[in-house]
């Protein structure tokens, strides 16, 4: 069965952090985790397998920052990074039932206009490039993770919906007042994400915000 067939019918568990696990294996401060898909593929796969062996159903590809802005000026392409990451993830899932690889998309690192200088259309294009690569290389779903900018959430979701037919999950980050960085409250943020067609919505890394204040809406 595919991921969408199980969503909402069974409890499915995501893995945990990838970056801190790679740090424990030797990733140095300032080193790009995504480059380990080429230089330390066995270590990246071992992280995925550890989570799967302990009950996770969904592993996140090592692509949190795999956007063209991050690799500007480097002799490497987004497609190469995404392809290598998904190859590792799919190898970790091989032979397992109910094991899926999510293409993991994090923030670009820039605020979108009008709060910052990244145009909305460019953000859509940046995410679209990653989504197309993920779909081409066999991702089971798209995870848009740890988002706090309303405009960037819209850009990433539109890119996902326009460039693939995979299930899309969005996780949001709220501050201690239950607000996104750009000011939307929980209800408004959830309504927006739901309206844009996300298959599931979650909350991560909120500070002092009681679980029931987000959980009631997600």
PLM features per residue range, with description:
Residues 207-214:
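Conserved small/polar residues in nucleotide/adenosyl-binding loops
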Residues 74-96, 154-170, 216:
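Alpha-helix-loop-beta-strand connector modules within alpha/beta enzyme cores
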């Amino acid at each position: 069965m595919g991921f969408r067939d199980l969503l909402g019918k069974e409890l499915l568990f995501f893995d945990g952090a990838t970056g801190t696990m790679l740090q424990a294996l030797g990733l140095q401060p300032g080193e790009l985790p995504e480059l380990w898909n080429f230089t330390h593929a066995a270590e990246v796969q071992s992280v995925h397998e550890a989570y799967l062996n302990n009950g996770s159903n969904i592993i996140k590809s090592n692509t949190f920052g795999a956007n063209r802005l991050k690799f500007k000026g480097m002799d490497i392409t987004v497609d190469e990074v995404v392809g290598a990451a998904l190859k590792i993830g799919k190898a970790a899932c091989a032979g397992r039932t109910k094991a899926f690889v999510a293409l993991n998309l994090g923030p670009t690192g820039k605020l979108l206009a009008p709060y910052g200088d990244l145009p909305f259309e460019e953000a859509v294009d940046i995410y679209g490039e990653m989504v197309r690569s993920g779909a081409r290389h066999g991702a089971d779903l798209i995870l848009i993770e740890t988002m706090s900018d309303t405009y960037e959430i819209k850009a990433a979701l539109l890119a996902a919906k326009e460039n693939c037919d995979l299930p899309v999950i969005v996780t949001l980050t709220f501050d201690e007042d239950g607000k996104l960085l750009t000011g939307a409250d929980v209800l408004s943020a959830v309504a927006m994400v739901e309206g844009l067609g996300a298959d599931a919505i979650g909350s991560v890394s909120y500070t002092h915000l009681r679980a029931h204040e987000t959980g009631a809406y997600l």
